[in-house]
Amino acid sequence: MKRFLNLMMLAVLAFGMMACGEKKLTQDDLKKAELTLMNEEGSLNMEAVPVAVEQFCKFVEQNPNDEAAPQWLFKALQVEIKAGASEKAIELCDKLVKDYPTFENNPAALVMTASEVYDSQLHDLDKARATYQKVINDYPNSDWAKNAEKMIEFVGMTPEEIFSKIVMSEMEEVEGEW
């Protein structure tokens, strides 16, 4: 009898644990999490970042074939870039491009990763150039490829150096027209 009661207790516990499984996230849950990302001053609420990004990624994990999945992965990437979480941003960009190769915002994701992560945050100029080159090679007819061609010229430069280079280039064009 005691053995039977132990087995029943184990079965009830196992059933209870299964019933307490992970909640399936909805897009409404994600929209609520997204609203927590900005504070009253309009800047990123760093305390909300881990929870929101975790929810965005969990939705993608739970619903990999949902048409909104790549958009939420892209949103997670944008948040991690803004938060300065370079390694996490790189992982998210890689996952986005690999798992959703036809997603329309992949070129934007790559350009943001090249510019904000590799160039500005990590100062890994070779990876920044390689990522821009990937955009040029993989999306040659996109506006992002045209931007990447220009951005390669500016890798490693400060905003002041970029401005100076642009002004000098425009001055040379004007002089050539005379």
Model-based region annotation:
Residues K32, A76, T113-A114, I152:
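Structural register within alpha-helical repeat arrays
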Residues G21-K23:
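Bacterial signal peptide processing site
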Residues Q27-K31, L35-K75:
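Post-signal-peptide N-terminal segment of Sec-exported extracytoplasmic proteins
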Residues G16-A19:
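C-terminal motif of bacterial Sec signal peptides marking the signal peptidase cleavage site
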Residues F59-A69, K98-P107, L122, I136-K150, ...:
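Short solvent-exposed coil/turn linkers within tandem alpha-helical repeat scaffolds
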Residues S43, E80, Y118-D119, G156:
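Residue at a conserved register position within TPR or TPR-like alpha-solenoid repeats
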Residues S43-Q55, K82-D94, L122-L125:
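Helix-turn-helix repeat elements of alpha-solenoid scaffolds
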Residues R129-A130, K134-D138, D143-W178:
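Terminal, low-structured helical/coil segments at or just beyond the last alpha-helical repeat
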